[in-house]
Regions:
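Substrate/cofactor-recognition hotspot
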Residues: 1-184
C-alpha cells in the first residue's frame, strides 16, 4: 500500500520515523504553519526539526530510525544482520547529505522510500507492511486527536456519535456499544 507523499503524510512519516511520535492536530497544525511560512517548504522545516539530533552520529540517528520503523531482530523474521544492514543503509544516506544540511529531508525521503517500495521486499516486506498500517493510523489519529502520542500507542477512547453522544473507554473486548442503525 503506497502512501501518497502529501505534506501531511511526509510529516507523519518523519515524526514517527525520527521522533517515534504520532502528532495530534495541534502539533500537526503548528508544523503545517511552519511549512507555509518557510521559503524552503516542508524539506526546510524537516531539516530544522533535525537540529536536536545534530550532535549525534549518523549511525546513532540511523539506529533510532530503523528501530522506530520496526526493523528489530526477532520481529518479522528479521535477524541482527538485517538490522545492521538497514542501519548501514540509512547511515550512508545521512552521511551523503550531511554536508548540505539536509539530514531532515533525507530522513523523510528514506521513510517515503521504505513506505512505498519495501512491502514486496523479501527481507523487510513484513516490517514495511506493518509500518504502513501504523502510518495510516497515525494520519487518522492526527485528524481526530489534539494530543501527541507515542507512535504505536493504542487509542482506547473512541467518540461514538448517536442520540446520546456517549463516550465510552476500555480495552479490547470489554466494550459493548450501541450500533447506529440509521439509513444513509
Amino acid at each position: 500500500m503506497a502512501i501518497i507523499p502529501t505534506t501531511q503524510n511526509k510529516v507523519a512519516l518523519y515524526a514517527a520515523g525520527l521522533y517515534g511520535m504520532k502528532l495530534g492536530s495541534a502539533t500537526n497544525s503548528a508544523v503545517l504553519f511552519d511549512v507555509q511560512n518557510n521559503p524552503s517548504g516542508v524539506n526546510g522545516v524537516l531539516n530544522g526539526y533535525y537540529a536536536p539530533f545534530a550532535s549525534m552520529t549518523s549511525a546513532q540517528v540511523a539506529a533510532i530510525v530503523v528501530a522506530n520503523v520496526g526493523i528489530k531482530a526477532g520481529q518479522y523474521g528479521l535477524t541482527a544482520q538485517n538490522v545492521a544492514d538497514a542501519v548501514a543503509t540509512v547511515t550512508a544516506e545521512l552521511n551523503a547529505n550531511a554536508p548540505f544540511g539536509k539530514q531532515g529531508e533525507t530522513i523523510a525521503n528514506v521513510m517515503t522510500d521504505f513506505t512505498n517500495t519495501y512491502e514486496s521486499n523479501a527481507v523487510y516486506g513484513a516490517a514495511a507492511k506493518a509500518w504502513n498500517v501504523k502510518i495510516a493510523q497515525a494520519v487518522s489519529y492526527t485528524g481526530n486527536s489534539q494530543f501527541d502520542a507515542a507512535f504505536g500507542e493504542i487509542v482506547t477512547e473512541f467518540r461514538l456519535t448517536g442520540a446520546e453522544n456517549e463516550n465510552r473507554t476500555g480495552t479490547a473486548g470489554d466494550i459493548v456499544a450501541p450500533m447506529v442503525t440509521d439509513a444513509l
